[in-house]
């Protein structure tokens, strides 16, 4: 995956390297671990270049881009946000590259005695809170909402949902 992201950085319009000693990468929070490693490797290979990393929800980063934030590379966690960036003419279409994918997972605390094998078990009275990314801002939240709605759990679980800014 790291090679794909490095390739993506090369393809995503890091053409300003000839004029600037800094590039700014805005990436989804879910990509933070990988991008920190990649940025360090990139800086090692290009000692004259400083990579500035900004992480957040894809929706928030898109808004920053829309309002003029100086972003050289934008890495969203989903197609919808990239489509929006393209529709708002915020990215160079020829540089857009799909380089990874997300997977929705359910995790529980080690202190939770309930082992969840089916999403319907989220209705269990002992489960008080369910944290998800806010569907208004995060792809993971939209994916969670879609799955819960498909299983007819979105409405029944509303009182338990804690919507977070990012993953």
Residue ranges and their predicted role:
Residues 33, 136-151:
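Bilobed "Venus flytrap"/periplasmic-binding protein-like clamshell domains
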